[in-house]
């Protein structure tokens, strides 16, 4: 039945039968189709006729309102997720093991390159409604399909080992990265080797690097774990041969190797010679070599191991030949991730001599107070050997000193070492081939030209050839396997002369003199050149700087420091020269400036806590710094 007052659909009334009076107009007769050219011509938009009862809008060219719903995508995916849960419009069923997972192809393909390739290429799966997957965990797949709809997933210890390979297969890189981030947070000595192997298996390069770095940095603890004991030979060899191993002493590497061998001694004893070649036996003390290594039956019964032991003992017995005897086994290890830390030791200011010390970390641009020495020392010589800092001689306000102490950055403590044979202040100190050299200085009565050498492995001082000139306020640096004693004061004049010590022949020879006379200057080596900065020429404090090239055999001037300095110290670090503290002719300084050889310019660096003249400075490569509970100071660089 038709509704009242309406015409039947599809029918029209002829004009002659239409009712008189007002009423709707009859529709216009159909028009013939326009010619092809006219149809192709773009039509001009006409203003829409106002509807009955509708508001009239102004026609403004280019005026419109853009709408952007920030929740549209979220709401759409929430709706699709609900549809999936109810099985609405699902066009694919994933079969894995005994599990069936319903989904929408378009959602999976839009999130996963793996599914995109499966459903859009000419693969048989693109036309199927049921697909079976292999080599993927059912629960992990279910979680990842749910993630495709919700963009949410929880990674934890219960699912990470199945979720990461599944995310890798489906190329869901965000989930894969989340798994790697979780594993990174779980690194511990007990599991880092396992995580490293897992990362390697699944080609997680960043996680692999981080886990490997963790193994190197925590090797002492890692070597005590079950995971280490179960490592194959190849991986043990790679670890113990690494230059980047973080060990307080080579004894830790030796003990780790023996523990691994003894875990399955019958199978592994054959590998002892190969393993011992990776242990840096020359860096062990002579007492340890004779008391432990030579006494170990696993080592003693292998001829190759006996040769390695003889090599190590020869390194100890002929210290002056260490430059010639050097091999990969005599090179100290440098911990992965370690950074340079500059130590300022002792020194003095007006009416005070300091025993306190501070250290500057370039990574944070901060100074930290570290443990004080047991003795106050100004005019002290400081150098680093291995992973320890040595403060040699100096002046305590009453007498010139022969005592020596060393700083352990791991424990943040100073320990006494064997004293020198001679009291020395204003001396030059440098390290070469694991030995500590002390030259010249003042013994309380006269300037000295004598020199001596300290071997930390044996704890003995040995006299070496004397310099040709008595030198007080001298500085010493090492370059190309030789020592250079630069300038100083001989009790009558300030010196421009320089002499070189060659350990192999135990002799000093003169080299080209500096352009200026200098005592109390700063001396350091950077990029194969010997630099001397500031000092005193007998009339004034200097800011001039010069550089010596062994190839040219001559000195040349470079940019002067911004401040006149003497009794300061100079050290190379991170490709820069740092001039630390000193005296400007009227007062002690806590300021520091650094030199860039690439731009030939000096710029200000962060100041120390304390003003220090006659200070000793050296650099250690450290992983964990600062020590616990050490005060810090961040001082902005100031205009010099």
Swiss-Prot record:
GO terms for cellular component: actin cytoskeleton; Cul3-RING ubiquitin ligase complex; cytoplasm; dendrite cytoplasm; glutamatergic synapse; neuronal cell body; postsynapse; postsynaptic density. Residues 287-639 are annotated as: Interaction with F-actin. Residues 192-294 form the BACK domain. Brain specific. Broadly expressed in neurons of most regions of the brain. Residues 90-157 form the BTB domain. Residues 1-50 are annotated as: Disordered. It comes from Rattus norvegicus. This is Kelch-like protein 17. Interacts with F-actin; the interaction disrupts the F-actin structures and leads to marked changes of neuronal morphology. Component of a complex, composed of PDZK1, SYNGAP1, KLHL17 and NMDA receptors. Interacts directly with PDZK1 (via PDZ1 domain); the interaction is important for integrity of actin cytoskeleton structures in neurons. Interacts with DLG4 and SYNGAP1. Interacts (via kelch repeats) with GRIK2 (via C-terminus); the interaction targets GRIK2 for degradation via ubiquitin-proteasome pathway. Interacts with GRIK1. SMART domains: BACK (SM00875), BTB (SM00225), Kelch (SM00612). Residues 21-35 have a biased composition (Pro residues). One of its GO terms (molecular function) is actin filament binding. It is found in: Postsynaptic density; Synapse.
């Amino acid at each position: 039945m038709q509704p009242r007052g309406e015409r039947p659909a599809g029918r029209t009334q002829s004009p002659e039968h239409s009712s008189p009076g007002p009423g709707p107009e009859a529709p216009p007769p159909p028009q013939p189709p326009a010619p092809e050219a006219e149809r192709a011509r773009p039509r001009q938009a006409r203003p829409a006729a106002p509807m009955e009862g509708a508001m009239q809008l102004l026609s403004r060219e280019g005026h419109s309102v853009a709408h952007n719903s920030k929740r549209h995508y979220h709401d759409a995916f929430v709706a699709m997720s609900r549809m999936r849960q109810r099985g609405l419009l699902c066009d694919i069923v994933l079969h894995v093991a005994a599990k069936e997972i319903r989904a929408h192809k378009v959602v999976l393909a839009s999130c996963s390159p793996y599914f995109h390739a499966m459903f859009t290429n000419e693969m048989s799966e693109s036309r199927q409604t049921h697909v079976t997957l292999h080599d993927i965990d059912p629960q992990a797949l279910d979680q990842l399909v749910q993630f495709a709809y919700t963009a949410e997933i929880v990674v934890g210890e219960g699912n990470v080992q199945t979720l990461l390979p599944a995310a890798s297969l489906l190329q869901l890189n965000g989930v894969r990265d989340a798994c790697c981030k979780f594993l990174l947070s779980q690194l511990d000595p007990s599991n880092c080797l396992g995580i490293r192997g897992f990362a390697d298996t699944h080609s997680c390069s960043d996680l692999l690097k981080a886990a490997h770095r963790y193994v190197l940095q925590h090797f002492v603890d890692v070597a005590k774990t079950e995971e280490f004991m179960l490592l194959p030979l190849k991986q043990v060899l790679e670890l113990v041969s690494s230059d980047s191993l973080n060990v307080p002493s080579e004894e830790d590497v030796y003990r780790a190797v023996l523990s691994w061998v003894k875990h399955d001694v019958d199978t592994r004893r054959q590998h002892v010679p190969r393993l011992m070649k990776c242990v840096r036996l020359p860096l062990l003390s002579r007492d340890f070599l004779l008391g432990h290594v030579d006494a170990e039956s696993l080592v003693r019964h292998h001829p190759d191991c006996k040769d390695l032991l003889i090599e190590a003992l020869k390194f100890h017995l002929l210290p002056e030949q260490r430059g010639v005897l050097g091999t990969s086994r005599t090179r100290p290890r440098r911990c992965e991730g370690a950074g340079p830390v500059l130590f300022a030791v002792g020194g003095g200011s007006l009416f005070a001599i300091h025993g306190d010390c501070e250290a500057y970390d370039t990574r944070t641009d901060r100074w930290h107070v570290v443990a004080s020495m047991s003795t106050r020392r100004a005019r002290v010589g400081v150098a680093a050997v291995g992973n320890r800092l040595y403060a040699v001689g100096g002046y305590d306000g009453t007498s010139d000193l022969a005592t020596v102490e060393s700083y352990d950055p791991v424990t943040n403590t100073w320990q006494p070492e064997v004293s020198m044979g001679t009291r020395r202040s204003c001396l030059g100190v440098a390290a070469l081939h694991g030995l500590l050299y002390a030259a010249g200085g003042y013994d309380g009565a006269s300037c000295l030209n004598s020199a001596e050498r300290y071997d930390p492995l044996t704890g003995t001082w040995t006299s070496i050839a004397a310099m040709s000139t008595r030198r007080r306020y001298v500085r010493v640096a090492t370059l190309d396997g030789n020592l250079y004693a630069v300038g100083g004061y001989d009790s009558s004049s300030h010196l421009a002369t320089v002499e070189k010590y060659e350990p192999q022949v135990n002799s000093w020879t003169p080299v080209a003199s500096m352009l200026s006379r200098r005592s109390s200057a700063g001396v350091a080596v950077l990029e194969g050149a010997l630099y001397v900065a500031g000092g005193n020429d007998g009339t004034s404090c200097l800011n001039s700087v010069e550089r010596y090239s062994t190839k040219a055999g001559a000195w040349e001037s470079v940019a002067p420091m911004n401040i006149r300095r003497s009794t300061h110290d100079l050290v190379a670090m991170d490709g820069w020269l740092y001039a630390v503290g000193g005296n400007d002719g009227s007062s002690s300084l806590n300021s520091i400036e650094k030199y860039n050889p690439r731009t030939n310019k000096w710029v200000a660096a962060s100041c120390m806590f304390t003003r220090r003249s006659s200070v000793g400075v050296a650099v250690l490569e450290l992983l964990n710094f600062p020590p616990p509970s050490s005060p810090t100071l961040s001082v902005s660089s100031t205009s010099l």
